[in-house]
Amino acid sequence: MTRQDLASLIRNIPDFPIPGIQFKDITTLIGNGQAFSEVIDRLHERYQNQQIDAVVGIESRGFIFSAPLAYRLGVGLVPIRKPGKLPAATYQIEYQLEYGTNRLEIHRDAFQPGARVLVIDDLLATGGTIAAACDLIEMAGGQVAELAFVIELTFLNGRERLRERPVFSLIQF
């Protein structure tokens, strides 16, 4: 499958979750076994020789791609979650959204010091969530090797916010 084939499987939902937003629905992509496998295969091919120590998935759609990729790479999976979801001691960070603030957490013992961490999320929009996730990873002793996204909304310029970090996206809109 080509990248264009994969992109054609992403459904556009107008006015969700609020009016004016064009939501990129990945359920049609992950519901197609061949396409879902292709996404994981392409990510695995990119990272298999990059000495990644852990894969971080961002709640919640990031988990869909981070878990099978961590398995394929033979490394651990570290979740970054919304507040109150992790049972042990955590680092927390609050970050700005267009319409308020949000918080994320990671376990304090998530990594060995200096671990090379690959961060996976489904979509790069403005970059606010992933920038906060990078700060959490560094608080926990990890080093961000690369940020990987299945989808990038280029018109929102999230990559600019992350310009000091390597960014990869499989599909751009």
Swiss-Prot record:
It comes from the Bacteria. Its main location: cytoplasm. It catalyses: AMP + diphosphate = 5-phospho-alpha-D-ribose 1-diphosphate + adenine. Pathway: Purine metabolism; AMP biosynthesis via salvage pathway; AMP from adenine: step 1/1. GO terms for cellular component: cytoplasm. It is an enzyme of class 2 (transferase). Transmembrane segments: none annotated. Homodimer. This is Adenine phosphoribosyltransferase. The lineage of its organism: Bacteria, Bacillati, Chloroflexota, Chloroflexia, Chloroflexales. The gene is apt.
